[in-house]
Amino acid sequence: MKDLLDIMRKKTDSDGHTPIEFDRIRIGLASPEMIKSWSHGEVKKPETINYRTFKPERDGLFCAKIFGPVKDYECLCGKYKRMKYKGVICEKCGVEVTTAKVRRERMGHIELASPVAHIWFLKSLPSRIGLLLDMTLRDIERVLYFESYVVTDPGMTPLEKYQLLTDEEYFNALEEHGDEFSAKMGAEAVQDLLKDIDLEAEISRLREEIPQTTSETKLKKASKRLKLMEAFKESNNKPEWMVMNVLPVLPPDLRPLVPLEGGRFATSDLNDLYRRVINRNNRLKRLLDLAAPDIIVRNEKRMLQESVDALLDNGRRGRAITGSNKRPLKSLADMIKGKQGRFRQNLLGKRVDYSGRSVITVGPTLRLHQCGLPKKMALELFKPFIFAKLQASGQATTIKAAKKMVERETPEVWDVLANVIRQHPVMLNRAPTLHRLGLQAFEPILIEGKAIRLHPLVCAAFNADFDGDQMAVHVPLTLEAQLEARALMMSTNNILSPANGEPIIVPSQDVVLGLYYITRDAVNAKGEGMMFADTHEVNRALATGQVAIHARVKVRVHQTVINEDGQREKQTIVVDTTPGRCLLWEVVPEGLSFEMINLEMTKKNISKLINSCYRKLGLKDTVIFADQLMYLGFRQATRSGVSVGMEDMVIPPQKQAIIDKAETEVREIEEQFEQGFVTAGERYNKVVDIWARTNDQVAKAMMDNLSFTNVKNKQGQDEKQKSFNSIYMMSDSGARGSAAQIRQLAGMRGLMAKPDGSIIETPIKANFREGLTVLQYFISTHGARKGLADTALKTANSGYLTRRLVDVAQDLVITEPDCGTMGGLVMTPFIQGGDVIEPLRDRVLGRVTAEDVRRASDNEIVLPRGTLIDEKIAAQLEEAGVDEVKVRSVIACESTFGVCAKCYGRDLARGHQVNPGESVGVMAAQSIGEPGTQLTMRTFHVGGAASRTSAANSVQVRNKGTVRFHNVKTVQHAKGHLVSVSRSGEIGIADELGRERERYKLPYGASILIKDGEAVEAGGIVATWDPHTHPLVTEVAGKARFSQIADGVTATSKTDDATGMTTVEILPVTARPASGKDLRPAIVLDTTDGGEQFYFLPQNTIVTVRDGETIGVGDVLGRVPQETSRTRDITGGLPRVADLFEARKPKEHAILAEVSGIVSFGKETKGKNRLVITPDDGSEIYEELIPKWRTINVFEGEHVNRGETISDGPQNPHDILRLKGEVALTNYIVNEVQDVYRLQGVKINDKHIEVIVRQMLRKVDITDGGDTSFIKGEQVDYIRVVQENQAVLAQNKFPAKFERQLMGITKASLSTDSFISAASFQETTRVLTEAAVTGKEDDLRGLKENVVVGRLIPAGTGLAYHLERRRQEAEAAEFELHNDFSEVDQAFSQALNQEQF
């Protein structure tokens, strides 16, 4: 294969040019000499072509003398024609005889009569010219556009260099000092100033100045200037080149002029812009020759500057120049940026030849590796192959004859086509291609008709359905392409999803229903209790109608079991089963046990079955099995006769009673509200809660009613059995529909949300079978509309998120087998409330252990470090009662470029350790982005019904076990129970092995009814609290004394007429009179030991104690009502994921303690409280100002730990990184992102999120340079700092100190080392400007850069090519990858053998 590449490389093109070999690309500023060296002549006239002869005008924008001939090998006047004069220059018209395509590469130039500043370096922020000259952009613009003079050389006068003078001041100065000083205006002045800069001297001056500056702004500016100047010095760019004396002209074929009918021309906007420049330049030359008055020349120079600005970047300054149709002209900058620009349209997204598209239909008779290709399409796509075959076999003498035969569609053509197509895979793609499974290879089968036929099982991967979807077909041409398509992209090789490692070739819908139907059992069906010798006998009995398909019978089956050491052993057993399950058993491959299918085959069970088939028996058997399952499922679904009828939606008889009860409860609350017991917010909350609960009750009654029917068994007694109701079967099997949808059909529709997301408190009590009233229908339309609108918006948002993710992760590739790090993440089961949402075995599956795993009970090693955990080992860990495992993670990987295979672990899509060269970054981005789009397209399936659960108010234990407190602080109440006074407390329940099975959050103020370490029974209540209010709990006993609580000033008191009770409510700051704005209402406790304890009351607190009352420990002083909750829906979810990955600071985020110590409150300012923490270690006191409206969770004198919450709110990821480290941050982001996806039932492996987080943590901020070359405040790559520090430490010098920086994915993509990658992502102008000024080099390490320059990517099969190139450069490459082509051969032959089954 390498030789093939060598041959490809030695090829030369028609002009005898060999393609250039290069390793990196550098971008810089061009000097005037350089521009002239590119040019083939000066463009002097604005004319384009002669409209009569259509020949280009001499010296014009399309001049043949400068740019080359218009026709191949023919000069303009026609004196020299044909190849033999190649290279001759015609003496008459001056045109060189050569190919016309040189008009695509030869440039020209324009000599500018006056220098012009390049707008990118002037206006692209920060202005580079401004930074170098240390002038403001406004001042430079005034000079450039001829509004003021600037002093370029003050001489002996009192004027200063860089000083701006108006006309008046200039003439006054002239009169006063004569020509002792010089001042100029326009770009010449700026050019002179730039020439005068002595970079060396300035750099050393700044280096001395920086350590002495105290002001933050001056320091920032100085370090920016220093960086820029050093970049200029190192890159050999000269500052004065930012002002141009010569303007390059683009080759004419890149700005074409096309004749339209009717004698008009269509032209590129660039020609207009160039014409403007040339016209003004020529006019200026003439004016200068005529020595015209200064003011006229000045105006012309300004216009020249403006026209060059428009050519380079139209609209960057002032109004954009428009063409005849009032549309702004497209300048050079617009050509390269944006979705339609050069990067994204032509370099990253090319169109391909040999492709076609058509509508898709179902191909239920196909095998998994096949697709149906219409004959018409195949004939067109494989034309070149057919021509070659016809010629080779002698059926056609020439290509022309072959072409004729194909056009006539003679019979032999079809034979040849069938021959060509055999063994030649084609690729099918469905847009949008959201992950790599959106493009797969199949073997084509020729079919009649015009629609492509697609195998039903791959629909899930393509996200395709047959309601008019279209798909594209591509033909891999070269042998290598066919080999890759076969070995890597064949649909049979992509059985597992790269996102979560579960099978993606899983039956759905009809197939599931069919399999579920035949594996159900029924009481007292025909033939119940019969005995059969084997499955053949069952088949006969079924066919003759002796036994029903659901009857409970006994059957003798022969099964092959694979035991522990991989040996197969045959067994014969008698099982209780049904004839239907025997039908299924006939297609199950040898090696799976009967018990796997001796149950109801719901979608979950089928998925498990396919998964274990893949793990135990390998790819080939699984593929055959999946196909067989599909055929069986389709057939049985048809025969079952399951369909939906109105009668199937059974409305529960208890419905009315449940609703009546709820209405009574609501009425009671309304009455309480009218009497003033509850606030409006509380009333709303409680009502919504009641209806949410009622809805659940109706739904439960309905499901109970639907799911079971009473039947008579053989003995004639009543027996409950699962219902054969069609709707219930569809939902129960997982084929279609969910409990939530059935609830709306036969229960009640429930609560609906308004367009703004708040819940309407009157629910829809009817269901779809009963029908909706006009009002109910109207309320429903909100949700339906919102669903559709959301879908449209979210698709775009989700696509954009994927694009950002791909961009940030694209250069992460597996580069080495093991980096040798000891670090990693500690994995524990993910528990929320009473459910183990993700058990430990799922979380560690496919990971490598980072240290020895020991059993908790006797500390014995269960697993050595460095083991890849597979299904078997994961099950052993669970049996050994291991509760946490430290595993390797990409977060901790120490590879310089990319990540190592050990830190990544298992390749999810292949089920074994990941191969070097696997592009894990892009895989991660696709895995996270793909469900984003799918979910957003799915928002409206529940029809906007508010999925809101009633608020929890207690912890009820599910399993028997012992209680564990996790950072819970408690005080003992007088009545004997404990009261929680911690904010982040959790309560866990551990089983007898010590493994935690449940975990609940404990709110502040909860009453805990049990002690730490005590045993509890299942169903026991451990803690209770009021979900609608937030209490203030005392931690000491004493006498209450009101402070600054004045009626009408800071508080308002309400007396209830019915009970005579008075409650005091604290007013919000905004509602207080002026006198109360700065007061802080509080309750002071005069404690029994003579001290006093302040409890400040937040706004809206309802005080529940009286002035002077005696208070015990754990009593409640007051309650703050809680706000209402919004509905959760991925609509909130997608932006949430984007926020997490963009590392945005949330509004009103939680305030964390920066140091550990004792809290006190200092002197407060107008709107803020001053929080003071006195550290334990005696370092300096930490102070922070917190706005008064924030609820502060800590009291005077309380002790806090670093990173503990001081004021509640959403977490700020930057704080977590700073105070708790990168592992805590990773866990936070992974769990938060997973929460959003889990809510939608989408499984994504944690690995993928970690990969993105690794890319977000690439940079560090230097806090102290030490003896390294870094400057304080600089942003550097983490790996670079670590390497530099190691080098410095080796010489016993001081290393640099740094803080890890968390960057959002957009920022991280733009701050990558590769300017090509960054420019093709976003903000093209800014990226290129910066890269050019600093003379950046691009090492072409990532995938994107290599695609742009048209190379194989350094991943997958392209990695070998890149490693080989690096090795040949003899730069002692870091590691060698011996390419083992025997593996590829093996894969190839295996692929060829797939025909046989």
UniProtKB/Swiss-Prot annotation:
DNA-dependent RNA polymerase catalyzes the transcription of DNA into RNA using the four ribonucleoside triphosphates as substrates. It comes from Acinetobacter baylyi (strain ATCC 33305 / BD413 / ADP1). Mg(2+) binds at residues 465, 467, 469. Zn(2+) 1 binds at residues 75, 77, 90, 93. Its EC number is 2.7.7.6. Belongs to the RNA polymerase beta' chain family. PANTHER family: DNA-DIRECTED RNA POLYMERASE, DNA-DIRECTED RNA POLYMERASE SUBUNIT BETA. This is DNA-directed RNA polymerase subunit beta'. GO terms for cellular component: DNA-directed RNA polymerase complex. GO terms for molecular function: DNA binding; DNA-directed RNA polymerase activity; magnesium ion binding; zinc ion binding. Keywords: DNA-directed RNA polymerase, Magnesium, Metal-binding, Nucleotidyltransferase, Transcription, Transferase, Zinc. Zn(2+) 2 binds at residues 819, 893, 900, 903. The RNAP catalytic core consists of 2 alpha, 1 beta, 1 beta' and 1 omega subunit. When a sigma factor is associated with the core the holoenzyme is formed, which can initiate transcription. Its cofactor is Mg(2+); Zn(2+). It comes from the Bacteria. Gene3D superfamilies: 1.10.132.30, 1.10.150.390, 1.10.1790.20, 1.10.40.90, 2.40.40.20, 2.40.50.100, RNA polymerase II, clamp domain, RNA polymerase Rpb1, domain 3. SMART domains: RPOLA_N (SM00663). It catalyses: RNA(n) + a ribonucleoside 5'-triphosphate = RNA(n+1) + diphosphate. It is an enzyme of class 2 (transferase). HAMAP family: RNApol_bact_RpoC. Binds 1 Mg(2+) ion per subunit. Binds 2 Zn(2+) ions per subunit. GO terms for biological process: DNA-templated transcription.
